[in-house]
Structure formats: structure tokens, C-alpha cells
A protein has these predicted regions:
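Catalytic cores of enzymes
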Residues: 1-263
């Protein structure tokens, strides 16, 4: 309750962002990815360049992945998910960042503060023992296949200026964290709220790629076309999937929860 009170005080009188949504999706995780060979004309209109490689951060990602047994395979439905969202928004009000442009430089650029919604469709890492090793995984190589720092760590997130009305983390277990005495739950949700977002949509367990794409499509249609608030839009989308014989199992839709301001 106290956190919610602080959030409401912080956003009171805040001017709405002028644009609708920034989407970072379908990053390139490996030099073996076919997009490295065909990077000329790669999709994504972000003008930002990849971050300068940082050996310490790359090692941190390696350690974080090793500790939880994570591997970073391409998530094919994240592109479908992102493209579906962007179709709902006028081109002048969106920022698509796909492939190599779905990188750390894009995620940390002040330009993101111009958008009401920031959507990450990629892998997430949650390390409950060492929360400082938690983060969002973005493009790990550049167009030439050269390794680069693509790990948006929890400490990076805390240092962002991201006053978006909503941050969506369409990744696995992004809503979990470590309970630290006197500090509460330390995780990605808290990081993005500290950065300025009053609402963060996250998952509580490993999610199905296709099911998540379907849920996000319905969620954004409810929010952007029917003008429902995020909490109401999520509930409506989940009920629709429950009633759809293709997606009835809660595994496909129940993992996602909205943290923070529900109004």
C-alpha cells in the first residue's frame, strides 16, 4: 500500500508522453543466427547504434545464465507479437526495434521517455539468490556477429529515466524476485517502478511463446482499441482465452499479472 501511495504521488501531475508505444523484440542472441548473414536491411527503424562491448557485463550475463541453466534461443513468436501490437498504432506514434536494434543502447536511450508504453518481447533472467544478476536479454551480437553487451541488468534498470505509463515484460518469470529484509522484493518489477513506471506487466512462471503472443495481441486490442485500463484489459484478455478452446489451459494465460497502479 505504501509503495502504491508513493507511485500515485510521483505520477500526480505528470504530463502524458506524446507517443504511444516502443517495442523491443526478437533480438539476435548468437553469431550463428541467420540474420547475421543477412543483416543488410534488417528490420527495425531505431537509429541507435549497439552499445560498446563491456567484458564485465558480458561475464555477468554468462554467470547469470549458468546459475539458472538458461539458454537464449530465438523466440519466433515475439516478432509476430510485436508486429501485431504495432499494427494498432499509427506509425508516427510507435518505435519498433527488432533484430540488432533491439539492443541495450535502445533500451537505455532517453528517447524511450517519449512513449506511454514500453514493451520488451525477449528473454528475461531472474536470479532469486543474486538479484543483481537479474535482467532483460537483448541483442548479444552486432550485424557482423561481434559479441556486444546486450544484458540490461537490474542496476541498469534502476538507473533509467523511464516515466512510461506501462512497461510490459513479455518474458519468463519476470515478476519474481528476492525478498530482502528491510527492502521488500528486489526484482525487475521494482527496478522499472523505481525508473518511473507506475505499472509493470510481468509473468510469474515460464511462459509459452505462442500463448504469450496470443495474450498480448488480445491485451493490446482491449487497451488501444477499446480504451480499457491496463488491469481491465488484461483481465478481459485472460477471460477470452479461458473461454477459447484453443487456449483454455491457465498455462497459456494465467502467468501474467499487473503490478503497481491498477486504476
Amino acid at each position: 500500500a505504501s509503495t502504491l501511495a508513493v507511485i500515485r504521488q510521483d505520477i500526480n501531475g505528470r504530463k502524458p508522453a506524446p507517443k504511444t508505444v516502443a517495442v523491443l523484440a526478437d533480438p539476435v542472441f548468437s553469431a550463428n543466427d541467420e540474420r547475421v548473414k543477412t543483416s543488410v536491411g534488417a528490420n527495425g527503424r531505431s537509429p541507435l547504434q549497439p552499445a560498446t562491448p563491456n567484458e564485465v557485463d558480458i561475464l555477468a550475463l554468462t554467470r547469470a545464465a549458468r546459475e539458472i541453466g538458461a539458454t537464449f534461443q530465438r523466440l519466433p513468436y515475439t516478432r509476430k507479437e510485436a508486429e501485431g501490437i504495432l499494427k494498432l498504432v499509427p506509425a508516427a506514434e510507435e518505435m519498433p526495434a527488432f533484430d540488432f536494434t533491439a539492443n541495450r543502447a535502445t533500451a537505455t536511450n532517453p528517447q524511450l521517455s517519449q512513449y506511454r508504453i514500453v514493451h520488451f518481447a525477449t528473454h528475461g533472467i531472474l536470479n532469486s539468490v543474486h538479484p543483481e544478476l537479474s535482467g532483460v536479454v537483448l541483442s548479444l551480437v552486432d550485424e557482423k556477429g561481434t559479441p556486444q553487451n546486450g544484458f540490461l541488468r537490474l542496476n541498469d534498470i534502476f538507473n533509467l529515466n523511464l516515466p512510461a505509463e506501462l512497461v510490459v515484460l513479455s518474458a519468463c518469470e519476470t515478476g519474481l524476485g528476492q525478498d530482502v529484509k528491510g527492502e521488500g522484493l528486489v526484482g525487475l518489477t521494482r527496478g522499472f517502478m523505481y525508473a518511473g513506471a507506475p505499472r509493470v506487466l510481468v509473468s510469474l512462471w515460464s511462459v509459452d511463446d505462442a500463448g504469450t503472443s496470443e495474450l498480448m495481441s488480445r491485451f493490446y486490442k482491449k487497451m488501444l482499441q477499446e480504451n480499457l485500463k491496463p488491469a481491465a484489459a488484461l483481465r478481459a484478455a485472460q477471460i477470452e482465452m479461458l473461454q477459447d478452446t484453443r487456449w483454455t489451459e491457465p498455462y497459456y494465460w494465467a502467468a501474467f499479472t499487473l503490478q503497481g497502479e491498477w486504476r
